[in-house]
Amino acid sequence: PANDYLLKKFFRIPLDENVSRSRINAILFYYTAWYADNGGEVTEANDYDAVGIWSLPGQHLPATLSDDPKFNKIFFDDLDKRKYEVLPPSMGYYYLFMIGKDLSQPNVRGSVRTILNHYKERADRDNCAVVLEAISEHAKSVYEYFGFRICLTFKFGEKEVNSQGILDPEGEGFTGHLMIYHKDGEKVLRL
């Protein structure tokens, strides 16, 4: 639900507009191509069982602002501010825009691990960080397992949707976590 909410916001689609799974998939394909066209990397593991969309140190794509100032403040102003408070000056970082696993193949395991480990190894070699936002508690626990540290916990979608993404003017929205990995995180990240 949180991913669909975010895609609607990024594409300026009203939250009350019906959006089919085909249209959500088209938005995902658009972002995949946009990242690939603009110097990002699209990586896969286990014959596309998992796919990750990344930007590279010094080559981050411009923000795709929504038409919602409150959302933009959270996702672009607040998260960027905290990221730069935590990272040492001039430290580069890999940014995980999105990662997905083919849930129709539950017997295929280790795909997300393969992708995350590849970028952690690159970051270690380059003395860079890896930055991402976990938009579910499950994702947060997976990233913590891989050594990511929570830098900021934030709410989004409050008073717009409930935790299932259903419109609700009193809804609690979603909880996200800005997370950063660095091989020497205990020493260099300013948490």
Language model features with spans:
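Helix-loop element at the rim of GNAT/NAT acetyltransferase active sites that forms part
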Residues: 1-18
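Active-site rim helix/loop that mediates acceptor-substrate recognition in acyltransferases
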Residues: 14-41, 53-55
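Conserved acyl-donor/pantetheine-binding loop and adjacent beta-alpha core of acyl/acetyltransferases
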Residues: 34-107, 122, 155-172, 185-191
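Conserved beta-strand-loop-alpha-helix junction that forms the acyl-donor binding cleft
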Residues: 97-104, 131-140
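Glycine-rich acyl-CoA binding loop
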Residues: 107-119, 123
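Conserved active-site alpha-helix within GNAT-family acetyltransferase domains
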Residues: 122-127, 136-160
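Short hydrophobic/aromatic beta-strand or adjacent loop that forms the aromatic wall/cage
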Residues: 173-178
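Conserved beta strand-loop-helix elements of the APE1-like EEP
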Residues: 179-184
